[in-house]
Amino acid sequence: MSMSTSTELFAHHWAFAVFLLGAFGLCALMLLGAFFLGGRAKARAKHVPYESGIDSVGSARLRMSAKFYLVAMFFVIFDVEALFLYAWSVSIKESGWLGFIEASIFILVLLAGLFYLVRIGALNWTPSRSSRQVSKPSVVININNSHPQ
């Protein structure tokens, strides 16, 4: 690399180098500031959970319902699909018929996967194996206050 090439390289990329230096410097400054200025607890109960001044009850690890993961999967699937289709729609003139065919194949593969997941029941909000069957009561309870005469 000659001197003029390295000078040109520096001239073109100096702003990025300053940005990286500033970002790493700011991270280091915040970490060091928290280390030196932050308080330290030296009590025995340092690692005990604190619940509004009372002793904690039960475990802090709660089991999340699978419905939350299902919503997250829907979001990721349709977000990525929308991202690719948006990029395709922006460049539709440049891609021509070949791009249209590729986007159609992409959509068909996604639809095939979606229909497969619906068919096997992977996207059911309440799967049939976990839904409770409510039976009718065998005894009818009279709750009105009329007395027999």
Curated annotation (Swiss-Prot):
Subcellular location: Cell inner membrane
Physiological role: NDH-1 shuttles electrons from NADH, via FMN and iron-sulfur (Fe-S) centers, to quinones in the respiratory chain. The immediate electron acceptor for the enzyme in this species is believed to be ubiquinone. Couples the redox reaction to proton translocation (for every two electrons transferred, four hydrogen ions are translocated across the cytoplasmic membrane), and thus conserves the redox energy in a proton gradient.
Stated name of the protein: NADH-quinone oxidoreductase subunit A
Membrane as UniProt keyword: yes
Gene that encodes it: nuoA
Native organism: Photorhabdus laumondii subsp. laumondii (strain DSM 15139 / CIP 105565 / TT01)
Transmembrane spans: 16-36, 68-88, 98-118
Top-rank EC class of the record's enzyme: translocase
Record-linked PANTHER family: NADH-QUINONE OXIDOREDUCTASE SUBUNIT A, NADH-UBIQUINONE OXIDOREDUCTASE CHAIN 3
